[in-house]
A protein has these predicted regions:
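Beta-sheet-dominated interaction scaffolds and their linkers
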Residues: 1-41
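Aromatic-lined carbohydrate-binding surfaces of glycoside hydrolases
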Residues: 122-124, 128-131, 140-356, 362-372, ...
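Active-site clefts of carbohydrate-active enzymes
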Residues: 399-428
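Glycine-enriched alpha-helix->loop->beta-strand junction motifs that scaffold or abut catalytic
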Residues: 354-357, 373-380, 400-406, 438-441
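Substrate-binding cleft of secreted/luminal carbohydrate-active enzymes
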Residues: 423-473
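Extended acidic/polar, glycine-enriched regions
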Residues: 38, 44-47, 96-156, 184
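Catalytic domains of carbohydrate-active enzymes that cleave complex glycans
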Residues: 298-306, 310-330, 334-365, 455-557
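Surface-exposed binding patches on compact interaction domains or structured appendages
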Residues: 2-15, 43-110
Length: 557
């Protein structure tokens, strides 16, 4: 009736999973770990995951209730389907609901486990059946053995996760007022799992329509507004520009309280999209920056239109962050400049305001990286360009240092990515690849950006399903995590464990085991025509599990 299977398997529809059964699972002490439970039903059935006997509309129908018997902390979840670009339903959502009809056939459930006690513990799944007002009967039970090591998972997740936050999208999807109390309640709900996953960066949108709404005005299928709106409220009073920072400060405080504010990134000041299609309105400045201002003197809204006023606007932002003692962790973010010259005007302007400003780039175009001779701390480079550097096809500045950088993927490449169509092992591999590259972390442009409809297949010619988000908008403003996000989170903690092992055993010992899973950097190559990465990394759950167990045993000696 059930079997335990690896957490890295993605179910297609209600088909049986093509994988081996698990009887045992290894985990570090205090490590959250997971398996999936493959359930077979011979008919559509109402299923409860809690003690409460919830009923469908039909009333006291035949139902199943799951119960977990273990000294281990456990929680069981339903998994939900998402329609992928190939029009095939695939499991990706870890659902918050506690009861549901499950269809005839196979359904995967998600089981999370965590223990602070060393030893081999039984995790027994019991299934009870009842109908009408009859007493329950135990119809099936199965036990997984969880081996918990005496070695503890590192308390601090040092992985430098840098997922971009789209706060305006949350207001749209829940239809609440932008930057209202209700909006901030939802924002905090969504930031909590992000912080738990190792997020270190607080993103501040400080102009209007950054990224030009991802050029959503060009998309006529699944029409959606994807614009971001300024966290700051600029206004003119008695002829002077003034800024209301209340929403910005409130978001910073949320991030600080959650422990995800080691760095602040300012978006929308330079390197902003899009000159060609979303117009330049500043009279003597070539960046397509738009800052909407409420002129209280005339009771009208306008935009900043002169370089002088824009300079004053940026100066006040910088001064505010200095006053809040946040300047030393602040960086001005520019997204994918094609070359150094494209952002030189913006750099000159902000350096004129403060010469100690730190600028950060997400590098997609090799020409920029080859000609940039500044500090690259916390920069991020797309995977295919990193491979070019390693293969000698792209030079990097002498000041460049990959150890203080992150890497990223986006709509490209097609593999080693985190789409719904991607193998889940590719999300887990992020932590291991980051260790292989000897980098500090990983950046991605997505976390919670959604189309206006419930059809998540937006711009499939450009963005594969899942490219825009890692979590789903659940009811009551609470996110539902994806299988992809869970694997990414686990991989981040694996990275922290690998770094801990390195401090005790040496990098050579740890890297030798990691390479069995990731392969060598020299084996990686990128095909520009197919947008695919070739390499010797393995989609092998058992191999991945064995690395952690071997390292834990070495630490015991």
């Amino acid at each position: 009736m059930i079997r335990f299977i690896p957490s890295t398997v993605r179910q297609i529809g209600n088909l049986k999973n093509n994988c081996e059964e698990l009887n045992n699972k290894f985990a570090l002490k205090n490590e959250e770990t997971s398996v999936q439970i493959e359930l077979f039903l011979d008919k559509k059935t109402w299923v409860n995951l809690d003690d409460v006997l919830t009923l469908p509309w039909e009333g006291l129908v035949e139902n199943l209730r799951f119960e977990i018997e273990s000294v281990v902390d456990c929680k069981l979840y339903f998994e939900g389907d998402v329609l992928d670009d190939d029009k095939i339903y695939k499991k990706d959502v870890i659902l918050n609901k506690r009861s549901s009809y499950l269809p005839k056939g196979y359904s995967n459930l998600w089981l999370e486990m965590k223990s602070d006690t060393e030893g081999i513990h039984n995790v027994t799944i019991k299934i009870f059946k009842s109908e009408g007002s009859d007493d329950e009967e135990l119809i099936f039970q199965k036990t997984l053995k969880l081996e918990v090591s005496s070695i503890e998972i590192p308390e601090k997740n040092i992985f430098y996760l840098d997922l971009w936050q789209h706060l305006s999208s949350l207001a749209r999807v829940y239809d609440v007022e932008y930057y209202s109390d209700e909006h901030f309640r939802i924002i905090e709900n969504f930031m909590k799992p992000l912080a738990d996953a190792g997020q270190k960066v607080c993103d501040l949108i400080v102009s209007d329509y950054s990224w030009a709404g991802q050029e959503c005005f060009k998309i006529y299928d699944n029409q959606s507004s994807l614009y971001e709106y300024n966290l700051i409220k600029p206004y003119i009073k008695n002829g002077k520009l003034q800024l209301d920072f209340s929403a910005l400060d409130r978001f910073i405080e949320i991030c600080q309280n959650l422990g995800m504010c080691e760095e602040i990134n300012l978006f929308g000041i330079i390197g902003n999209w899009n000159r060609g299609n979303f117009s330049v309105i500043l009279e003597d400045f070539d960046e397509p920056i738009k800052v909407r201002v409420h002129n209280l003197d005339s009771s009208k809204f306008t935009f900043i239109r002169t370089k002088k006023m824009y300079e004053e606007y940026v100066r006040q932002i910088f001064e505010h962050l200095v006053e809040k003692d946040l300047w030393n962790i602040t960086r001005v973010m520019a997204d994918q400049p094609r070359n150094v010259g494209e952002v030189s005007e913006g750099e000159d302007l902000i350096r004129k305001i403060r010469d100690d400003v730190k600028i950060k780039y997400a590098i997609m175009h090799g020409d920029f990286f080859e000609n940039y001779d500044g500090d690259t701390e916390n920069f991020s480079i797309i995977l295919n360009e990193y491979i070019r550097v390693q293969n000698g096809g792209l030079k990097m500045s002498d000041k460049s240092n990959f150890q203080n950088m992150t890497w990223y993927v986006c709509w490209t490449p097609f593999n080693l990515n985190q789409f719904v169509k991607s193998s889940l092992i590719e999300s887990r591999l992020v932590g291991y690849m980051t260790y292989l590259f000897d980098m500090k972390g990983f950046l991605r442009w997505n976390y919670c950006l959604y189309p206006d409809s419930n059809d998540y297949r937006y711009r499939p010619d450009r963005w594969a399903c899942g490219d825009m988000f890692f979590v789903y908008p659940g009811k009551s403003g609470v996110p539902e995590l994806s299988l992809r996000f869970k694997q990414l989170s686990y991989g981040n903690m694996d990275y922290s464990f690998l770094r801990y092992c390195e401090s005790k055993l040496g990098r050579c010992t740890v890297l030798g085991l990691v390479k069995e899973f990731t392969g060598e950097i020299a084996d990686l190559s990128y095909n520009e025509q197919t947008r695919e990465i070739s390499g010797s990394y393995k989609d092998d759950y058992n191999l991945m599990e064995s690395i952690k167990k071997k390292l834990a045993l070495k630490l015991k000696k």
